[in-house]
C-alpha cells in the first residue's frame, strides 16, 4: 500500500487516474506516483539536501493561508464557542496571501498496469466512467451497485473465485468498476468483470430478491449516522455541490427501478 492506502483502494485509485484528471493529480499526492517521487527524493537527497528543504518550505508557505479556507465543526454551542476561539488563534499564524489556481497539465492516459509486491494475492480493478460514454448519472447507479456487488460479484469473484471480497464500485460521479480483495486470480477475475454484461442482459430476480437489493441500496444513503459522520457528509457535499434536492432525486429514481431499467444498462457495462 502507499501512504496508508489499502491495496485494493490503491488499485482503484490508479484505475481512476487513467480517465479522470482529478484522480491523476491524486496519484501525485498519495498514490504510486507519489511513491516514485519519494524514491527519487531519497536517492538524490544526499547530493543536495538544502534544495529539498527549500522546496518543502515553499509548499508549506503556499498552502498555509486563510485564503479560501473552510473549517467544519460538529458539536454543541458551548463547544463551538471554544472551537471558534482556538481556531481564530490558530488562523492568526497563517498567511493571508491569495492562492492562484494552477492548470493541471498532466494528461490522463490508459496504461493497463500491473504492480508486483511481496504478497501472493492480488487486488484486481477494471472500470471506466460512464459519463465519458454519454450516459448520465442517476439513482439507478446506486441500485446497480447493490445488484452487482451483493449478487453477481459476490458469487463469482468471492464464492467461486476464492477472493476475500468482490465489490462493485459505482459512484455518483459516474465511475463504474469491479474490484477484488485478496484475490488468488487475475485473468479469471477480469473475465468475471466482463461477465457483468451478460448478467445484466438476463437480469430477472424474484420480487423478494429485487426488494432485498432495493433495501440494500437505501441502507447506503439513509443509514443512521453519528455526529462525526454527519459532519463528514456535510463537508463532502459542500465541496462536491451535492444538494439535498439531488439526493432526493436519487431516492426517487431508485424507487422507480425495474428489471427492464437494469437490463438497459447492459450495453454500457
Model-inferred region functions:
Residues 52-60, 254-269:
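A short, acidic, amphipathic alpha-helical segment used as a generic capping/interface helix at domain edges
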Residues 55-57, 108-114, 163-165, 263:
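Glycine-rich, charged/polar anion/phosphate-binding loops
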Residues 55-59, 86, 143, 153, ...:
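Short, hydrophobic/aromatic alpha-helical segments in well-folded domains
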